[in-house]
């Protein structure tokens, strides 16, 4: 009976040692190798960065200062016109609400 207990104890210790050793190896694998999620994240970031750089290059190649100035001028004149007509409309509404004839 003593040999059986010794054999069972030896097997239990062997299984525990293998389990602990397996956990250590799994931790080392996780620490050294990137996970699938991090690999996918890195590839998506690289694709995004390359697409962003390509769009920036295309914008810089097609950028025309004359067109930019025209757009700014059109914006300023249209906002000035809208501001004037909004003021006129506001005055009309206020005069209708106040009842002045």
Curated annotation (Swiss-Prot):
List the gene name: APOC2
Belongs to which family?
Answer: Belongs to the apolipoprotein C2 family.
* Residues of the propeptide: 23-28
Please give the biological process terms from Gene Ontology that the record holds.
lipid catabolic process; lipid transport; positive regulation of phospholipid catabolic process
**Which source organism does the UniProt entry give?**
Acinonyx jubatus (Cheetah)
Q: Enumerate the residue ranges of region (Lipoprotein lipase cofactor).
A: 78-101
Name the domain of life this protein comes from. Eukaryota
Task: Name the job this protein performs.
Answer: Component of chylomicrons, very low-density lipoproteins (VLDL), low-density lipoproteins (LDL), and high-density lipoproteins (HDL) in plasma. Plays an important role in lipoprotein metabolism as an activator of lipoprotein lipase, the enzyme which hydrolyzes the triacylglycerols on chylomicrons and VLDL.
| Protein name (Swiss-Prot/TrEMBL) | Apolipoprotein C-II
**PTM description:** Proapolipoprotein C-II is synthesized as a sialic acid containing glycoprotein which is subsequently desialylated prior to its proteolytic processing. Proapolipoprotein C-II, the major form found in plasma undergoes proteolytic cleavage of its N-terminal hexapeptide to generate the mature form apolipoprotein C-II, which occurs as the minor form in plasma.
The stretch of residues making up the signal peptide is: 1-22
Pfam families in the record:
Apo-CII
* GO CC terms in record: chylomicron; high-density lipoprotein particle; low-density lipoprotein particle; very-low-density lipoprotein particle
What terms describe the molecular function in GO for this protein? phospholipase activator activity; phospholipase binding
Query: Region Lipid binding: what ranges?
Result: 66-74
Q: Where is this protein found?
A: Secreted
Predominant location category:
secreted
User: Which controlled-vocabulary keywords does the entry list?
Assistant: Chylomicron, Glycoprotein, HDL, LDL, Lipid degradation, Lipid metabolism, Lipid transport, Secreted, Sialic acid, Signal, Transport, VLDL
């Amino acid at each position: 009976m003593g040999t059986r207990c010794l054999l069972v104890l030896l097997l239990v210790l062997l299984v525990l040692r293998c389990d602990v050793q397996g956990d250590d190896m799994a931790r080392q694998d996780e620490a050294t190798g990137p996970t699938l999620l991090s690999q996918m994240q890195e590839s998506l970031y690289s694709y995004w960065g390359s697409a962003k750089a390509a769009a920036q290059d295309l914008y810089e190649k097609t950028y025309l200062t004359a067109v930019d100035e025209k757009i700014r001028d059109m914006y300023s004149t249209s906002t000035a016109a809208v501001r004037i007509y909004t003021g006129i409309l506001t005055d009309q509404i206020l005069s209708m609400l106040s009842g002045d004839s």
